[in-house]
C-alpha cells in the first residue's frame, strides 16, 4: 500500500501573519476574569446545566497533535471534544485544527497566549531549556513493565501523577501564561526502527540515528552512532531517502506516520521500557482564565476522557505499527543483549547526572519503583490484561477496544483533583 504521509513538518508551514486576538465576552465572568458558579466533580448533568444556564455559548480553537481526524492518534482529541461538548450541553464548541496548521510547536506558546489557539497538545520535549522538568522526567520512564497494553496504562498513570505532584513542573507552564490540563503525557514506550536489520554493537556503529530528546543523544553516541535531531514530521522523508538509517520512535508516531513502512526493522528492550516516553502536555492558553468557572471545570474534567484517549491512541497506533512493519517485510525483535546493556547503563548514568545536578531527588528511583508498584496494582484491580505479545498485537487488540476511563478517574481523583479550578 502507498505510504501514509507524515504530519506536516513545522518547517514546511507557510508563513502567516498572526491574526488579531479574538475579542470574547464571557457571560457570568466577574470583571472579565473567570467567575460565576461552579459545580462539584461528578455532579449530575442537571446540576451542571443549572450552573451554565445563564452563560453564553463559546467556541474554542483546539490544536491537537494528530495530523487528521482519521489518524490513529486522533482518539484523545476526539474523546475530549465529545466529553466537553456533551457535558456543556452544547454550549462549548471545540473547533479542531489538525496537523499543527495554526502554529508549529516552535510558535505554539505565542499562539496560545495571543489567542490564535485556545487549547493544544504541546510537544514540550523539543524545548528542554524552557521545560527542564519534562526533560528530566523523560529520562525516568524506564521503571515499569514493557507489557504492550498494561505497560502503557501503568506508565501513563505514573507519569501523570508525577507531573501533577511536582509544583515546579506546573509552574513551568504557568509562568508562560499557560494552564496545564494534563501536565505530563506519554506517547508510548520507545523503540528503535531501522531501514536494515541488526541491533548488535557492530550494527549500530556508524549509523545515522534520528533522536527525539536529549536522552537519545547520549544513547546514540554510546552505540557509536551519529545522533541527528529532527522533529517527527521530517523523519519519514529522511528515512525514505536514506538521510538517516534509524530512528528512536514511539507507537503514536510509528503507527500514525507510516515510518515503519520505510524503517520496518524494530528493536525493543526485552524486560524493561526504554527511557524517554514522557514528552508532552495538554494545555490551555490565556483565554482559559477568562472563561466562566463552570466552563473551566468542564474542560478540566474532560481530562479523564482525554487520558483514556491518549492510551487508546497509543495502542491503536501500536497495532498499526505492527501491521506496517510486517507488511514491509520487517519484524519486532528484542534488542541485542550487549547493545541493550550499553543503552541501559547510559539511561542510569543520565539519572545519576540529574541527581548530581539537583534536578531529581536522590531517591527518585525508589519513588518511581513505588509508583510502578502502586499503579500496577490499580491496573490489575481494574481488570486490564495483556492477551498476547507486542509481536502479535494486531491479532489480539482491537482498535478502541479497551476503555481506560476508570483508570483516568483514579489518576484524576488521586492527582489532578487538587488542581481543579474552583
Where are each of the predicted segments found?
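Short, low-complexity disordered leader/linker segments with a strong preference
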Residues: 1-59, 399-422
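Extracytoplasmic "Venus flytrap"
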Residues: 32-79, 99-103, 253
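Contiguous mixed-secondary-structure segments that line small-molecule binding/active-site clefts
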Residues: 36-48, 125-208, 212-225, 326-420
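Short, polar/charged alpha-helical segment
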Residues: 47-49, 70-92, 214-218
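Pocket-flanking alpha-helical
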Residues: 74, 97-140, 191-196, 247, ...
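Solvent-exposed, polar/charged alpha-helical surfaces in well-ordered, non-transmembrane soluble domains
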Residues: 78, 82, 86, 106, ...
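Short helix-initiation/N-cap motifs at beta->coil->alpha
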Residues: 97-110, 213-215, 228-241, 337-338
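Pocket-lining segment of extracytoplasmic ligand-binding domains
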Residues: 228-333
Amino acid at each position: 500500500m502507498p505510504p501514509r504521509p507524515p504530519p506536516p513538518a513545522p518547517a514546511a508551514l507557510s508563513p502567516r501573519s498572526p491574526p488579531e486576538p479574538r475579542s470574547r465576552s464571557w457571560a457570568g465572568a466577574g470583571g472579565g476574569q473567570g467567575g460565576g458558579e461552579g459545580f462539584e466533580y461528578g455532579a449530575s448533568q442537571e446540576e451542571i446545566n443549572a450552573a451554565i444556564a445563564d452563560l453564553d455559548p463559546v467556541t474554542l480553537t483546539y490544536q491537537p497533535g494528530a495530523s487528521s481526524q482519521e489518524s490513529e492518534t486522533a482518539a484523545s482529541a476526539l474523546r475530549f471534544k465529545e466529553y466537553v461538548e456533551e457535558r456543556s450541553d452544547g454550549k462549548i464548541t471545540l473547533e479542531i485544527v489538525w496537523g499543527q496548521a495554526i502554529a508549529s510547536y516552535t510558535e505554539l506558546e505565542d499562539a496560545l497566549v495571543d489567542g490564535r489557539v485556545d487549547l493544544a497538545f504541546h510537544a514540550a520535549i523539543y524545548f528542554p531549556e524552557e521545560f527542564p522538568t519534562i526533560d528530566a522526567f523523560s529520562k525516568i520512564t524506564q521503571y515499569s513493565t514493557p507489557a504492550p497494553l498494561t505497560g502503557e496504562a501503568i506508565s501513563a498513570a505514573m507519569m501523570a501523577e508525577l507531573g501533577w505532584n511536582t509544583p515546579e513542573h506546573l509552574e513551568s507552564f504557568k509562568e508562560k501564561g499557560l494552564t496545564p490540563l494534563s501536565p505530563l503525557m506519554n506517547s508510548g514506550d520507545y523503540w528503535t526502527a531501522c531501514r536494515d536489520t541488526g541491533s548488535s554493537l557492530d550494527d549500530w556503529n556508524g549509523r545515522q540515528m534520528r533522536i527525539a530528546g536529549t536522552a537519545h543523544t547520549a544513547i546514540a553516541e554510546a552505540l557509536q552512532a551519529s545522533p541527528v535531531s529532527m522533529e517527527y514530521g521530517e523523519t519519514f522523508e529522511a528515512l525514505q531517502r536514506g538521510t538517516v538509517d534509524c530512528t528512536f520512535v514511539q507507537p503514536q508516531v510509528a503507527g500514525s506516520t507510516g515510518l515503519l513502512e520505510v524503517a520496518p526493522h524494530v528493536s525493543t528492550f526485552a524486560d524493561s521500557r526504554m527511557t524517554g516516553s514522557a514528552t508532552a502536555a495538554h494545555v490551555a492558553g490565556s483565554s482559559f482564565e477568562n472563561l466562566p468557572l463552570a466552563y473551566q471545570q468542564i474542560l478540566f474534567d474532560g481530562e479523564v476522557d482525554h487520558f483514556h484517549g491518549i492510551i487508546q491512541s497509543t495502542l491503536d497506533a501500536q497495532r498499526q505499527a505492527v501491521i506496517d512493519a510486517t507488511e514491509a517485510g520487517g519484524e519486532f525483535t528484542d534488542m541485542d543483549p550487549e547493545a541493550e546493556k550499553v543503552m541501559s547503563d547510559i539511561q542510569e548514568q543520565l539519572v545519576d547526572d540529574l541527581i548530581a545536578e539537583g534536578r531529581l531527588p536522590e531517591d527518585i528511583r525508589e519513588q518511581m519503583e513505588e509508583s510502578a508498584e502502586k499503579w500496577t496494582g490499580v491496573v490489575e484491580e481494574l481488570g486490564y490484561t495483556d492477551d498476547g505479545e507486542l509481536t502479535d498485537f494486531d491479532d489480539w487488540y482491537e482498535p478502541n477496544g479497551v476503555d481506560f476511563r476508570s483508570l483516568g478517574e483514579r489518576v484524576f481523583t488521586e492527582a489532578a483533583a487538587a488542581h481543579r479550578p474552583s
